[in-house]
Amino acid sequence: MPHFTVVPVDGPRRGDYDNLEGLSWVDYGERAEREDSDGQGNHRENSPFLCPLDASRGNDYYDRNLALFEEELDIRPKVSSLLGKLVSYTNLTQGAKEHEEAESGEGGRRRAAKAPSMGTLMGVYLPCLQNIFGVILFLRLTWMVGTAGVLQALLIVLICCCCTLLTAISMSAIATNGVVPAGGSYFMISRSLGPEFGGAVGLCFYLGTTFAAAMYILGAIEILLTYIAPPAAIFYPSGTHDMSSATLNNMRVYGTIFLTLMTLVVFVGVKYVNKFASLFLACVIISILSIYAGGIKSIFDPPVFPVCMLGNRTLSRDQFDICAKTVVVDNETVATRLWTFFCHSPNLTADSCDPYFLLNNVTEIPGIPGAAAGVLQENLWSAYLEKGEVVEKHGLPSTDTLGLKESLSLYVVADIATSFTVLVGIFFPSVTGIMAGSNRSGDLRDAQKSIPVGTILAIVTTSLVYFSSVILFGACIEGVVLRDKYGDGVSRNLVVGTLAWPSPWVIVVGSFFSTCGAGLQSLTGAPRLLQAIAKDNIIPFLRVFGHGKANGEPTWALLLTALIAELGILIASLDMVAPILSMFFLMCYLFVNLACAVQTLLRTPNWRPRFKYYHWTLSFLGMSLCLALMFVSSWYYALVAMLIAGMIYKYIEYQGAEKEWGDGIRGLSLSAARYALLRLEEGPPHTKNWRPQLLVLLKLDEDLHVKYPRLLTFASQLKAGKGLTIVGSVIQGSFLESYGEAQAAEQTIKNMMDIEKVKGFCQVVVASKVREGLAHLIQSCGLGGMRHNSVVLGWPYGWRQSEDPRAWKTFIDTVRCTTAAHLALLVPKNIAFYPSNHERYLDGHIDVWWIVHDGGMLMLLPFLLRQHKVWKKCRMRIFTVAQMDDNSIQMKKDLAIFLYHLRLEAEVEVVEMHNSDISAYTYERTLMMEQRSQMLRQMRLTKTERDREAQLVKDRHSALRLESLYSDEEEESVAGADKIQMTWTRDKYMAEPWDPSHAPDNFRELVHIKPDQSNVRRMHTAVKLNEVIVTRSHDARLVLLNMPGPPKNSEGDENYMEFLEVLTEGLERVLLVRGGGREVITIYS
């Protein structure tokens, strides 16, 4: 047998290689041409991340440090060349991108996208404030406090604010579960709940936003005609303040005019709306500050707004000036206008007077007593009224009697019947608007950070304003004034304006402009929402509304929005439109909470929100609260809203495809399973729904016992009881003779699955060859859409010592089968050292060595493992390799950004691997590998001799490797910078005694073998990577590593096994991962 000696040599200068016999320097700069398909199933798949990088591929292929992966670099590119693309994403939704490309017909020419730059304050917090504060605060909150009382008003505010806060928490979880492109709330809901629910809820949200525009316009008209310019009314009501047909017609005419003007403004350009947005917000803030200033001033100097009372009834002050029955003029008692109204005569005769007017005195009380007057105690309790009932003050003396019907218009009366539920429906729109920030997601610098912080902060701020306003109004304003919706008792002043400082006009003007601004914002946002739904193409008849002007403005959608808003204008009553608005928003919020609860309970791998302060119980509580509020405020409106959503759902489902509901004969379970399987079979899952569905291939011993049960343990830890797990095995033989054996093996595996707590199915096949049986399992396991997408395959231990080449041939053929089937492959090496389900790692790392990108499996697997109690405490580290021409600092930044978008917590490290010369150790090890392979083919050795020879080579490999990698400091100090080099000594070989009868004639030619250049490069990759990995990850709990693909030429299979051995040498637990050729993890929500 030939001998090898290990001798120290000088450092690796290029000239030293020339002294080695049979070694010539190879120039690796030139690359060979590549084919689109390798004939072994390694087909390309179109993907934004798995794409041929023709521009830079030339240098990549023959990079010495990555030569082991060179055959597949066109479909599995280098990480360094990919990170820039991964972190630079577009703000357009997928549907919008497809729509734009279809319209332009050329995807090549694109306008340079402007980078999003808005932060939390300007992008989320202030827009949410502007949308939440609205017309209800200024026009209805005082009336609500007077009607419901301070305590019940606080309860209404608490319920509504809790509803929006819980929804905001759920929305924050969804918004931080990936990058939220433009499309905001609709995008989040539709991508979380699917097209049917997403389309239904998206349209509900759109209708809610459209009716909000109508509500704001009606509020602006009410302010204009009631408080700013009452003479501008075209129609005059028969009574003083009743909502007669004349008043409603005024609202309709002016509302239509306002709507037309606002639509024209939005059509001309949304930039004008955005320019005035800050002005409108300033109006809101100034108005609120003036209310607080007036409340403080009322403590020591309350404003003078007297209220005229007849008995305990409140009189409407807009038709008379003097609050008295008679006055003395020139020592003569004369009747006032008030007497004239009640007695229908200027004379002081009581013949035709109203009986109640004669029996009760006229008094005047302060409308704003101030915070120090103690009216809060009187205003604590509710005073609900029926329609037409007079507003009365409790505690004032009054003689009850029937009055004249025509005198009713002189009192302040309730225009609608009130109750707790009615007030809830009217008030709820004043807490909507929480999605204004998420609707601007495309403009946010960091949506995952800004949306939760800005939205929740805005809700807390507005809630505090509402709570304090309720208490302030109850403490400062007289109860009868609070219940006076239109301010008739205080000379037709806006009630909240009477408290404001320095003037009521601050509130009147401020509220008018803020409601106009909110209406413009709604008319701007609603068409864009409809355009996003139309571009998704889930509702065919809406497709036309996806088109717009050349600059993308949704012209047709704006027209439809204006028409629907006109329906709200025709209703003409703010109190009637508000509950409709509440229904649609509550429906939307209900499904946001449902989406969060469902995602949390299903525990899909893609559900990794950065926002951690959520729980499915909070989402369920928010969903229940939304449903309860819908039926509490208006049960018939709730039914109509749910009917509309249901019809949209069924329409989208019908348009998508015909659905199979099952025959129902064999029971509900079978019907549901069949229906679900038929649904699943429609196509592959979306990237965000991808989870590993495992096919675990087990090896059985002669007694049909599982040889490596830790494979099942690993599968149970990876799955954590979720998803599909199929355990398969092959029995070699004839099916007719081995059927009973297969049944016994299946039962043995099922028992082991129960022990290891693997929830799944078992399948044992009988085949004449193990390779064929494994191929059959890979092809045929599963049913319909419930099929495996990942294969767990054990490592063939002892393949070097085996006399039968099938030991490693079966393994490599199975690798090729999984690649051809586009399945992911997981190969746990040293499986005996993997932890059991009863062990706990209290610390340590799971190290990911991301060499090439093949779909993101390497990032997803540690996340799934860490969901299990065994690996829960382990921290994740990601290493990637940088070459000489890579910017390692930028790579580290890009990788950190990419992981941030993936919502994965991991330490990031970029390892620089210089293009060092190929070491003599690498060269000699390659030579030994090829010589050993040649010798085993050529020599007719007995089994004993073959085992001894193979073990001898292995022992020399291990000893040399340990000496090279793990030499202690003492030896290093002696050797200095010397390297270890293996040298083939021909003299020793010639002097070696050996029996020529056991050797072929051409054995002597083995010493003249030159190692294949590609094998030298591959061995160099394996050695260098192994050195780096062992140095940094020798103490890791688990190392995940890209698995190189098998060679295209099957003659190099044995060398491929050797490369994998060298790559993983010295590591305790290794998981070799090979992606299936598709993306399995995404930064998007």
Curated annotation (Swiss-Prot):
Residues 142-149, 226-248, 298-419, 474-504 are extracellular. Phosphorylated, phosphorylation may regulate transporter activity. GO terms for cellular component: membrane; plasma membrane. It catalyses: K(+)(in) + chloride(in) = K(+)(out) + chloride(out). The modification Phosphothreonine is found at residue 983. Disulfide bonds join 308-323, 343-353. Residues 1-119, 173-196, 441-450, 532-554, 599-612, 652-1085 are cytoplasmic. The modification Phosphoserine is found at residues 24, 47, 81, 88, 734, 916, 967, 1050. Glycans are attached at residues 312, 331, 347. It is a multi-pass membrane protein. ATP binds at residues 697, 699, 707-708, 730, 794-795, 797. One of its GO terms (biological process) is potassium ion homeostasis. Inhibited by WNK3. Pfam families: AA_permease, SLC12. K(+) binds at residues 131-132, 216, 429, 432. Chloride 2 binds at residue 589. It is found in: Cell membrane. Chloride 1 binds at residues 433-435, 589. The chain crosses the membrane at residues 120-141, 150-172, 197-225, 249-271, 272-297, 420-440, 451-473, 505-531, 555-575, 576-598, 613-635, 636-651. Homodimer; adopts a domain-swap conformation at the scissor helices connecting the transmembrane domain and C-terminal domain. Heterodimer with other K-Cl cotransporters. Mediates electroneutral potassium-chloride cotransport when activated by cell swelling. May contribute to cell volume homeostasis in single cells. May be involved in the regulation of basolateral Cl(-) exit in NaCl absorbing epithelia. Belongs to the SLC12A transporter family. K/Cl co-transporter subfamily. NCBIfam families: 2a30. Activated by N-ethylmaleimide (NEM). Inhibited by DIOA. This is Solute carrier family 12 member 4. It comes from Mus musculus (Mouse). The lineage of its organism: Eukaryota, Metazoa, Chordata, Craniata, Vertebrata. The gene is Slc12a4.
